[in-house]
């Protein structure tokens, strides 16, 4: 039985949480990505947003952030076209729409975020065919996904 790689789209909030608290669930997901157990997927918007947030709130982490991106070498989701983006813009801000639409175009296994206010509001999940989860729930999904291969 061949185990396909579990591809997880990391929202900016989860990536930053992993940098700030490597011992948490977000940090564990990054370690799984480092080990090649899961495939980290991001979009150009996530990288730009992370750099912008860190430059303003945690400037001491900007260089570490850039080194980590190079080390992790995430898969880059395709940039969405205006047509792809339209239904996402009806429910989300421009930045969030760009991120979730890119995840959708990348056909990921899960979308992991700490931004529950926006990504988990009514109607957003109907735009995608994958679960939108917080890091601890993503770890539980991963465990459930690999369970059949452990026996």
Give residue spans per PLM region.
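Intrinsically disordered, low-complexity and often Lys/Arg-enriched segments
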Residues: 1-6, 149-151
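Alpha-helix capping/helix-boundary segments
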Residues: 14-15, 46, 98-99, 117-119, ...
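Hydrophobic/aromatic ligand-binding patch that stacks against planar heteroaromatic rings
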Residues: 32, 102, 124
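Acidic, metal-associated active-site segment
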Residues: 93-110
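Acidic, PIN/NYN-like endoribonuclease modules and their adjacent C-terminal/linker elements
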Residues: 109-110, 116-151
């Amino acid at each position: 039985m061949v185990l396909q790689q579990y591809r997880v789209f990391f929202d900016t909030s989860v990536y930053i949480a992993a940098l700030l608290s490597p011992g948490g669930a977000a940090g564990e997901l990054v370690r799984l990505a480092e080990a090649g157990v899961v495939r980290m997927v991001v979009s150009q918007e996530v990288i730009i947003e992370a750099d912008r947030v860190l430059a303003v709130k945690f400037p001491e982490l900007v260089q570490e952030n850039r080194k980590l991106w190079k080390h992790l070498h995430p898969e880059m989701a395709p940039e969405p076209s205006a047509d792809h983006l339209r239904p996402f813009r009806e429910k989300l801000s421009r930045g969030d729409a760009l991120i979730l639409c890119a995840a959708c175009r990348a056909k990921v296994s899960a979308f992991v975020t700490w931004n529950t206010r926006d990504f988990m509001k009514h109607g957003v999940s109907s735009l995608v065919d994958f679960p939108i989860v917080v890091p601890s729930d993503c770890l539980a999904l991963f465990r459930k996904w690999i369970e059949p291969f452990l026996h």
